[in-house]
Structures are given as structure tokens and as C-alpha cells.
């Protein structure tokens, strides 16, 4: 017995490895996740047949982390969303992996968590057993075995006690390549996973099935790595340390790549910039009016999960040879811990001229620039999204989303382009014979928990304008800046203005020797306005697309722009709830929610696989430094 107990103790201590006084933001390990799930299942409140939907680090208290004297006492906790299919109940369990104890249990009412592999498998099994599906395929001369079933979130607010999904169908390819080019157009099913039944079947009289499109796949072997001559970045206990930058990246099951405790070291002091930055939510509304398309509006973060959809990144193909790759562990429905290999990439790359000036032909001062890229890719059904945070030597952070993969297309009778845009080409674009790509939009809501030098910040809106002719603009060339502080959450609902070159500055009470406030400026990038009508139920569920900026007061539980459970949600969740109290924002801990958008009007060049398109915005130091910080970085200043 004693020997067994000793072995168990050794195993437990080895398994935990839980950062006694280290970095609390590091990715949960396989061992920690196993301990957390075992602890939860041992609790009497854990439903016997419940599924694990997501697990994540229960983040440490911001106040405790900023108080360095208390860091050693912080718990290491794992939070899990639990779904009991037998009752339809949702729970949130939090377990302390050091003490192997349950810290908190919450019952979440009227909610449906994001979809998982078990839901996809159940959906396919239900529809394949349904006689009408099999009969419909046989009428088309298609063997049901040759049909691929694609499961979507239902796209509608519905009774939260019933777990609903949609199914659409494609013809399989013999080699498994590009199944999305042969949709069985006009057929779809609404499936109740709770009762395991088909609730609605849509079938047009003569579904269109396009012929196969030429394969897009190249040989899967990566190209030989090209030597960049740049070093591979390093991590110290999970923290990236590159030149003056310090931060910790983590892959969340839901949000994907999330950055913690972002700082810039100046004169030996690691100055705060942001506590947490992540992709909070997405919406992809499709503009086709066909009955099998009107519900296709994907909340990709909250309905499917960016982390669960992580794709492996390969040197020589996705990232350069000098990349530092890291894996991430997640938990499947049944509690099995699964590690996804090489899903986080960190690499340095050339960034061109950092600065340059030629005082004369023989007196040129210049510095070459580099930048650090932190990257994650999510393959969600047909689309691939690449989220990158790019850190520059001048203190700028660029947030970039790459959009690639395969377009979602529909089968059609059209064999040529219709210049007038009749029939199906009113709402979709001809990309190949019998293949139309519906017009759609992509909205990305980023949550930016800014802590510029302190947790007490002020957000200022900055506009440029040309004053009327007169004393202020006698010669017609004047450009003035208007600034006003956002005082409350309701005032913090703001829009991009191109005529006013609008930006937003987050400043602290710290000032330079000359009285300039220390600040970072949000410089907007890709912008799109929603084409969904104001009465559309999806638009009402996605209030974050109504404006480009929302400013709220920090609350650790307010993480998701469309709410914690957008699947089958009703209107008014997320940001509308967070702003209900209209909290004051002057000298408070503020969070910026910035939404950028992309309009996708399909081109033939987007088919059969899309070249990567990019949408981005920037966080730019504005008075944070007293002079150009590139001058202080490592590297030789070249003169001639």
C-alpha cells in the first residue's frame, strides 16, 4: 500500500508541473487537463454522461498578477464547459489542478454550447438512417455512400432545450480533394439532435449538381526550407522575449490565438501595453435568398471554435524555416486529451527599411527593420483563417487576418457569365460552369484589453478636419485635430469616419518630460457595413457588426462580443448586456472591442482555391516613447 501510494504521489507531482512561481498564462499541459477532467468527474455534481465541450485556462486575477508580491499564491485552474445531452443542461466547472479540488460550478440556463465532433457524427448518423434522404439521393442517381454530409449550426434562434443543426450535402471525390465543388444544390435538413429526428427537409424539384472542378491540390510535401539568415525566436517559460517585446501566446479552444500581458522593455522596465488580446467573435452572413441559404450565417468562434479547428503549420509551406513551433492540447467530448501538433508559430522576418535619411550623397543613415510574427491557422469547413499578431521594432502591433481556403458555392444551371445578372447571378458570381459563389461578408470582432502603463486609462476620439475659411484657415490649407474623451459606455459606441481620418487613443496618466501623455492609438483598417436588414434576426444576434468600436469597462467574465453562448441565441446577447449599466470610463480599466469587415464579391481567380486576402488594423505608440524606439534596438546603424 505504501509503495503504491508513493508511486501515485510521484505520478501526481510529475503530472502537474504547474508553474509554482512561473508564468500563469502558459498553455495547459496534457497532464493538467487530465487532472482537471478527473477532478470534475469525481464531483457528485458532474452528470454521468455529460460531454466536455471546451476547456481553457481559468485566467488569474489581473490585480493579483500586477501585484508581484502575490504572484506565487495564484491558483492554477482549468475551466470546462459541460453539456449533458440527456437533460439539455449546460454547466461550467472550474478545477484547481494543484489541490485537485472544484473551485466553482455554474449551471447555465437557456444556452447551447458550440458544436463538437460528437454533434457532427450524430447529425450524419441521423440523416443517413432517414429513409427520405436515401430515397432523394437514389432519385438523382446518386449512391448515398457517395454523399458527404456537412453539419452547420442551425442559424436560427430556437428553443434552447433542443439542440438543432443543419445538414447540407456534397458529392464525394474519389481522392477526397475539394468536395466543396459539387454541392447537391437545393437540399438541406434541419436536425434535432435531442430527439434524434429530422424536423425539416428542403428539396427543390431538380437539384443542380456541378461537374467536378480541376483539382487545386499541389503535392503535400513542403518545399525545401529557404534559409532566411534570421534567428529562431525563443520562449522562456512560455513567454516570448524578442528584442524589447514580452508577451505570452496561448491557443484557446474557442478564441484560438490569445495574447497575454503584452509589454515593451524600455530602460530596463517592462512597461504594460495590454493585458489580453483575442479574436472575440466572427460573423459570416451569406447574401443568397434561396431557402437553403438564408440561414447560412456562421459565428465561427462561438459556434465552432477556432482552437478546436487548429491546423498544423508546416515549415517551408506555411511558415519560414526559422519558425518556433508549439503544440496545444485540448479535450474531446469524451474527456480524451488530444494534442494538436505545431499549431502556434512564432518567427522573425525582414521588414524592409526601418528608417533612412540621406543628408548628402555620402552621408546616409539607415537601419534595416525586422518584425516578429505570432500566427495561428483555423480550418473551419471550407474556409481557412490565419490570425497573425505582428510586432515591430517601433512599438507598433499589427493585427492581421488572412482569408483563404475554398469558397462556399452553389450548383446552378448557368454555364456562362450573365452580364445582366439574371436568375441566380443576382446574388452570386459565376466562377466556373454550373458553379456560382454567393456574395457574403466577414466580420471580425477583436477584444483589446488595453492597460497602457496602468489599468486607469482614458479613451480619446481623434478627428482631423479642415476649418472653414476665415481666421483659422486664411489660406485654405489648415488641418486641425479635434479630440474628446469618451466618458461612458454608451458614448463608447463609435464608427469609423474616413472623411475625418478617425482614430482612437488610449492614454495613461503618465507623461513625458515635455508633458506628452503616454498612449497607444487604434488605427482602423478593413471596414465593411452590414447589408443584412435591421430586422434580420442574425443581425439582431450580432450587435457587434453595427459599429466598428465599442468601449466597455473591464470585467473578467465579459469575453465574447455575441455572448458566451451564441449558438441558437436570441438577440441582445454580449455587448448590449455589457453596456447596460453605462459605466463611467474616465480613468478606468477599459476594454476596446474593434470590428473589422470584408466584403467578398467572388472572382474566377478565387476558384477553385482562394489566394489569401488580408484584413488588418494597428495599435500604434503615440507618446509612449520619447523618440523613435528603433534607435534603441539591437543592430548596427549603417552609415556611409
Language model features with spans:
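Short, non-transmembrane alpha-helical segments in secretory-pathway proteins
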Residues: 25-66, 115-155
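Bacterial N-terminal signal peptides
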Residues: 5-17
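A generic structural signal for short, solvent-exposed coil/turn residues
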Residues: 12, 47-49, 72, 141, ...
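Extended effector regions of multi-domain proteins
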Residues: 21, 98-102, 106-115, 138, ...
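Exposed beta-strand-loop-beta-strand "reactive/processing" segments of non-cytosolic proteins
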Residues: 47-98, 144-192, 374
Amino acid at each position: 500500500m505504501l509503495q503504491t501510494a508513493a508511486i501515485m504521489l510521484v505520478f501526481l507531482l510529475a503530472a502537474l508541473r504547474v508553474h509554482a512561481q512561473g508564468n500563469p498564462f502558459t498553455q495547459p499541459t496534457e497532464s493538467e487537463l487530465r487532472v482537471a477532467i478527473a477532478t470534475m468527474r469525481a464531483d457528485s455534481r458532474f452528470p454521468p454522461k455529460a460531454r466536455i465541450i471546451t476547456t481553457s485556462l481559468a485566467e488569474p486575477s489581473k490585480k493579483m498578477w500586477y501585484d508581484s508580491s502575490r504572484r506565487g499564491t495564484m491558483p492554477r485552474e482549468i475551466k470546462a464547459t459541460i453539456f449533458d445531452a440527456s437533460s439539455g443542461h449546460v454547466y461550467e466547472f472550474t478545477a484547481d489542478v494543484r489541490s485537485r479540488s472544484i473551485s466553482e460550478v455554474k449551471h447555465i440556463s437557456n444556452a447551447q454550447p458550440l458544436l463538437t465532433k460528437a454533434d457532427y457524427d450524430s447529425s450524419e448518423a441521423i440523416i443517413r438512417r432517414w429513409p427520405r434522404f436515401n430515397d432523394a439521393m437514389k432519385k438523382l442517381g446518386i449512391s448515398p455512400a457517395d454523399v458527404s454530409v456537412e453539419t452547420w449550426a442551425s442559424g436560427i434562434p430556437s428553443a434552447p432545450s433542443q439542440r438543432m443543426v443543419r445538414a447540407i450535402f456534397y458529392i464525394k471525390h474519389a481522392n477526397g480533394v475539394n468536395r466543396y465543388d459539387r454541392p447537391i444544390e437545393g437540399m438541406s435538413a434541419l436536425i434535432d439532435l435531442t430527439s434524434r429526428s429530422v424536423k425539416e427537409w428542403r428539396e427543390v424539384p431538380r437539384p443542380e449538381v456541378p461537374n467536378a472542378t480541376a483539382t487545386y491540390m499541389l503535392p503535400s510535401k513542403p518545399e525545401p526550407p529557404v534559409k532566411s539568415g534570421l534567428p529562431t525566436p525563443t520562449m522562456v517559460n512560455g513567454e516570448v522575449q524578442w528584442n524589447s517585446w514580452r508577451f505570452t501566446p496561448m491557443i484557446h479552444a474557442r478564441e484560438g490565438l490569445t495574447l497575454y500581458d503584452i509589454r515593451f522593455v524600455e530602460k530596463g522596465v517592462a512597461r504594460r501595453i495590454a493585458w489580453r488580446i483575442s479574436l472575440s467573435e466572427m460573423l459570416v452572413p451569406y447574401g443568397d435568398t434561396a431557402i437553403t441559404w438564408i440561414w447560412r450565417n456562421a459565428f465561427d468562434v462561438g459556434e465552432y471554435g477556432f482552437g478546436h479547428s487548429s491546423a498544423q503549420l508546416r515549415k517551408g509551406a506555411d511558415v519560414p524555416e526559422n519558425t518556433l513551433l508549439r503544440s496545444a492540447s485540448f479535450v474531446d467530448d469524451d474527456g480524451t486529451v488530444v494534442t494538436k501538433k505545431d499549431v502556434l508559430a512564432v518567427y522573425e522576418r525582414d521588414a524592409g527599411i526601418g528608417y533612412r535619411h540621406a543628408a548628402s550623397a555620402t552621408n546616409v543613415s539607415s537601419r534595416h527593420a525586422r518584425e516578429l510574427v505570432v500566427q495561428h491557422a483555423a480550418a473551419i469547413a471550407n474556409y481557412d483563417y490565419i490570425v497573425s499578431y505582428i510586432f515591430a521594432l517601433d512599438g507598433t502591433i499589427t493585427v492581421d487576418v488572412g482569408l483563404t481556403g475554398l469558397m462556399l458555392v452553389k450548383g446552378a444551371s448557368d454555364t456562362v457569365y450573365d452580364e445582366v445578372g439574371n436568375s441566380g447571378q443576382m446574388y452570386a458570381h459565376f466562377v466556373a460552369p454550373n458553379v456560382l459563389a454567393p456574395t457574403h461578408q466577414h466580420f471580425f470582432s477583436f477584444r483589446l484589453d488595453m492597460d497602457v502603463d496602468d489599468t486607469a486609462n482614458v479613451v480619446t476620439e481623434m478627428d482631423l478636419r479642415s476649418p472653414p475659411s476665415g481666421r483659422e484657415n486664411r489660406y485654405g490649407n489648415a488641418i486641425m485635430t479635434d479630440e474628446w474623451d469618451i466618458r461612458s459606455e454608451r458614448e463608447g459606441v463609435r464608427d469609423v469616419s474616413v472623411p475625418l481620418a478617425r482614430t482612437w487613443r488610449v492614454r495613461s496618466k503618465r507623461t513625458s518630460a515635455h508633458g506628452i501623455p503616454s498612449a497607444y492609438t487604434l488605427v482602423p483598417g478593413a471596414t465593411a457595413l452590414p447589408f443584412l436588414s435591421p430586422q434580420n434576426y442574425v443581425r439582431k444576434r450580432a450587435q457587434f457588426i453595427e459599429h466598428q468600436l465599442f468601449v466597455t469597462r473591464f470585467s473578467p467574465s465579459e469575453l465574447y462580443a455575441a455572448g458566451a453562448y451564441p449558438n441558437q441565441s436570441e438577440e441582445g446577447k454580449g455587448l448590449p448586456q455589457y453596456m447596460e449599466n453605462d459605466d463611467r470610463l474616465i480613468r478606468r480599466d477599459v476594454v476596446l472591442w474593434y470590428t473589422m469587415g470584408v466584403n467578398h464579391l467572388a472572382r474566377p481567380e478565387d476558384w477553385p482555391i482562394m489566394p489569401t486576402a488580408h484584413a488588418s488594423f494597428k495599435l500604434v505608440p503615440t507618446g509612449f516613447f520619447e523618440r523613435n524606439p528603433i534607435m534603441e534596438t539591437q543592430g548596427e546603424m549603417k552609415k556611409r
